[in-house]
């Protein structure tokens, strides 16, 4: 079944775990505006950004999208 709404809660858990939005923004060369838009539901990360984020946090894209609660990549 296709999920209608993307839940990025795990993305923001990971950002808090790293310390700050500004640090993640600098490290990944993603604008603070983009991260703010993701947080406020105005947009979602594109596929390239999702892969970058998953690699950065050491987790799966499915975890970031809220499709699984298992953080570890398989």
Predicted feature residues:
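Short coil turns linking two alpha-helices in DNA-binding domains
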Residues: 31-33, 46, 60
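DNA major-groove recognition helix of helix-turn-helix
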Residues: 39, 57, 65-68
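Short, charged recognition helix plus adjacent turn
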Residues: 1-3, 65-74
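Short, basic-rich loop-to-helix N-cap that marks the start of a DNA-contacting helix
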Residues: 42-52, 73
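DNA major-groove recognition helix of helix-turn-helix/homeodomain DNA-binding modules
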Residues: 48-63
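Short alpha-helical DNA-recognition segment
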Residues: 18-37
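A short, Lys/Arg-rich alpha-helix, primarily the initiator
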Residues: 1-19, 23
